[in-house]
Amino acid sequence: PERMPYQEWPATEFPNKKSCQTSHMPAVEEETRVAVTLGLPRENMGRHTFVGGNFFMLRVLNANRNDLGVAALPKEFEAAAARTIQHLREETAKVTIDQVVVAAGRLQADLTIENLSGHKFPTAYPSRRAWLHFTVKDRNGRPVFESGAMNANGSIQGNDNDANSNQFETHYNEITSPDQVQIYEDIMVGANNIPTTGLLTAVRYIKDNRLLPRGFDKRAVDQEIAVHGEAGTDTNFIGGEDKIRYSIAVGDSQGPFQVEAEVWFQPISYRWAVNLKSYKANEPERFKAYYVSMA
């Protein structure tokens, strides 16, 4: 998947196929300078404000600039991180609460999560993950239910893979318990069928339920960009969106209830960072220290 975003793009409904550069670095409409010294202004130059999703590493570099020999100014790094966060908020995914029904001591909430991009989201490198943070509070603001809370160390409450490296969190069509979390991610396994974060030891994907772009037919695409795991048979998981229901017991809690849903994103998930502990070389140990300091 880290090399498949462009292969995912032609499988969408977007009619104007173009290069990655054309999409992410659109041409400036007027002539522009390409260097501070010498040279004449040029036409059709691509914009160089290339926004991805890795706000975390931008801030790691900025916070450890002396150790890493970073030359760019602090305000420039922070501006890039802010643009990245804005991009993630506005142009990647959107969650909508379609309806909420309370009856017989249970609350049911139906959600739709849309992919706003032209490829799978999260995109490319498998350390990235997005998940749903869903909360219900009673009329006094007291918590009744929460799924997908993030711990201070960057792990997700209820995520089996964060708690145990040999397990992983499955894809859900309905969530009924706080220890169930809808995480959009790809999970690799080695020859022993145990989850791994090692690119050289992985042999296949046991889970890939990353949000599909619009028009993507999971039944017809090549194996290289296929859906893996429970999402493959989930009829609500289709090109452009996923629908999920939260069905929870509210007991004696009094409404009206406050129901909130958010899509959260990590460019480097907890398990990928923690697994570096097994490497005793200087570089991974430095990165572990950076990760902990930023978590």
PLM feature spans:
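Primarily the internal scaffold of c-type cytochrome electron-transfer domains
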Residues: 1-228, 233-238, 244-251, 260-295
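Extracellular Ig-like/FN3 beta-sandwich strand-entry sites
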Residues: 254-256
